[in-house]
Amino acid sequence: MARYSSVLPPLDLSISMGEGWTPLFLFRSGGPYYKLEYLFPTGSFKDRGSVLVMTEAKNQGQESVVQDSSGNAGASIAAYAARCGIRATVIVPRDTTEAKRRQIELYGATLEIVDGDRAAAASMALSLSGSTYYASHVWNPLFLEGTKTVAFEIWEQLGFRAPDAVVVPA
C-alpha cells in the first residue's frame, strides 16, 4: 500500500506487513478476474484498513485498542496491534468460529465473547471506547481509506483502465 501513500493518511512502514498488491488472477480468456485478497498477512483484505487504523493509534500514543468483529477484522486488528506493541481487546459474538477465535488469541489479543449478535459486540465495544481507542472497521474512516486501495490496484493491474464491473461477496 505504500505505493499509494500520496493519497492516504499517514502510513507507518514499521507497522506494515507488506499488505496490498495482491494478484489479479484471470480465470480464463475474456474474464472474469479474481483479486486474491486472501493472500494478505492475516488472510483478509481487512489488513488494508487495519494498518492505517493502527498507525493512527500508535501516533496518538494509545496503549490499548478495542475492536468488535465476527472474525476477520478482529484478527487483523489483533495482528497489527501486536506489531505496534499495543494491547488489543477483540469482542466477538458467541457464534464466531473457533478458528477465528484462536487466530485472534494467537496474535495476543484479549478475546471477549458476548451473547448475542454483531450488534451486541459493537455495543460492548462502544461502551469501552471512552477508555480505549475504538479501532472500528465499521466507523473509523481510516479503515475505509485503506480498503479503497483495492480500486487503485485493480485499475493499475488492468493497465490503467477501469473494469467493466466489480462483484464483491457479502
Q: Residue ranges of each PLM-predicted region?
A:
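PLP-dependent amino-acid enzyme catalytic core
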Residues: 1-170
